[in-house]
Amino acid sequence: MAGFTTPPQSGHLPSTSWDSSSNELLNKFFDSTVWSAKNNHADLPTDCPTRERHGWTGDAQIFCPTACWLFDYAAFARKYERDLCDAQRKNGCFTQIVPVGGVDSYMNAMNGSAGWSDAGVLIPWDIYAAYGDRRILEENYAAMCRYTRFKIGTLGKWYMTSLPTGVGPRHSKDIANYGQSYGEWAEPKDVKAFAISEFVCPHPEETTAYIVYLTEHMTKIAKLLGHIEDAREFSEAAKRVRDGYQHLVATKKHSLDTDRQAKLVRPLYMKLLNKPQTAYARKRLVQALDHYGWRLGTGFLSTPFILDVLAEINLDYAYRLLENEELPGWLCMPKQGATTIWENWEGPRAAAPASLNHYSKGAVCDWLFRVMCGIRVDGENHFAIAPRPGGHFTHAEAEYLSIYGRVASRWEKTADGITYTVTVPANCTVTLTLPGHPAQELTAGSYTF
């Protein structure tokens, strides 16, 4: 069949942003992200429109910050959070697919999986951070507390497929080695080959890390909503589980001396390590990237974090990885003609191709707005703009139609240096920080520096 067209199908998600740069492959990747997100947001955030079409919580969770840039997303996310709370188990566990059911209902043992079920807490926080509306936190606070206490309750427990961690009894009580989970998931095959044990065994490194991440988020949420005793409880849990994590990565089995980028990116992004461990992990991550030809070696959970981690070490490293066009990498997809985002890095070249319309890897677009162009909502009617030019880009720009109005940031390299252009919406202010210059306050209008 040929010669026919059909309109795209998606939920009602008004576009709220635009991004462009001198790198055409990155522009195509951004457009592909928008299309894949639209294809996968008909009433709920599905993983792909071509296979099981389930509401996978992990995909929704890692993409939420990007979705808040791309679309008017708050109402959609509030509805999905209600779905999560409706499906919450009596023990407090959020399910890993919402709504529950369908061909994958046999995977109920994966409920509570780190980075997936945590969506019930992380999505409300991301929506609050993007829009400043506390209602999603207030409406779901009790359910979020139940889930967090459920996760804390798994610490130190034994599971029938638990494997030894190498941590002694004093600190093993603060490590999560319980339940089935996905772990990092979908790392490149030459980094970490998939084994069936990935499904049936606990993943203590990933799960312990996410319990710290979870309890720290709940500490902030509890303080914001005035629940001081809850905040103290979650803060104390975060402190002791972080200590447990530091002992876990000091073992041979879970050592930071690894070429698996995810095992270094996660603790660096989540601030889980002590000072000596942090210094070592930073050096080891750069070494791991050297060994892998500065290609992307992270999996599902850590890919959205890696550019932030590299930018803290050296901004040039972040741009070097972003501009990589070889497989695995973000730009290898548009280079091969992709118009949507692939589930696996290999795309159609894989021996058994997976979905070719899977938006989750597009989560890196958050970095383009927030770091490359430097836009950040920083309170009611106020923004912070701190662009960080780099790499081989000659220009980059982004605009965001926020609930307060249109804000925009552009930079362009010229023979005389770098020119910056900023647009501030009516009745708003911006704290502008340009590289090498002190911060300055701007009122509504357009400015060029």
Question: What does each of the following model-derived ranges do?
Answer:
Residues 236, 240, 316, 320-449:
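Non-catalytic C-terminal accessory modules of carbohydrate-active enzymes
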Residues 93-106, 153-166, 246-257, 295-311, ...:
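Charged/polar, low-hydrophobicity segments characteristic of intrinsically disordered regions
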Residues 57-68, 74-80, 114-126, 204-219, ...:
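Well-ordered alpha-helical segments within folded domains of soluble proteins
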Residues 43-45, 102, 247, 282-289:
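Flexible, solvent-exposed coil segments and beta strand-coil junctions
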Residues 2-32, 38, 45-97, 130-207, ...:
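Active-site acid/base region of carbohydrate-active enzymes
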Residues 105-129, 135, 139:
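Thiamine diphosphate
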Residues 251-353:
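Extracellular polysaccharide-recognition and catalytic grooves
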Residues 105-108, 134, 183-201, 252, ...:
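Short beta-alpha connecting loops at secondary-structure transitions
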